[in-house]
């Protein structure tokens, strides 16, 4: 009995440390999200360079990455301390799209990245199918 009480207490302490760490990470991500918002506004309104459209698109994708990580942390707390798999898949798809936008010089690499996105979309479909849903 005493061993199980200690295990429960240790699990609760570790869960509290994890929650504090995730809240700190969420705060940092919100700060970066605000910083990226100002950067996007600057690129959109002030910059008139030729490369500004690429910077704008890359900035938007980075913005969505920050947003998805924050949504993942929110969902973690809402779902009883559980990270849903589909949010990680969304983040992976967005990160690969950003990679294609930033580094599209090699057609073979772009094809491999596109195949990876297709694989992630199929994985997302399977993860959301009724066979793999939790009850």
From Swiss-Prot:
* Record bears the keyword Ribosomal protein: no
Concerning InterPro entries, the annotation shows: P_starv_induced_PsiE, P_starv_induced_PsiE-like
Q: What is its main location?
A: membrane
**What's a GO biological-process term for it?**
cellular response to phosphate starvation
TM region positions: 14-34, 54-74, 82-102, 107-127
- Protein keywords: Cell inner membrane, Cell membrane, Membrane, Transmembrane, Transmembrane helix
- Carries keyword Transmembrane? yes
UniProt-annotated location(s): Cell inner membrane
Q: What is this protein called?
A: Protein PsiE homolog
**Membrane topology summary:** Multi-pass membrane protein
Family in the record = Belongs to the PsiE family.
One Pfam assignment = PsiE
An example Gene Ontology CC term for this record? plasma membrane
Q: Which residues form a coiled coil?
A: none
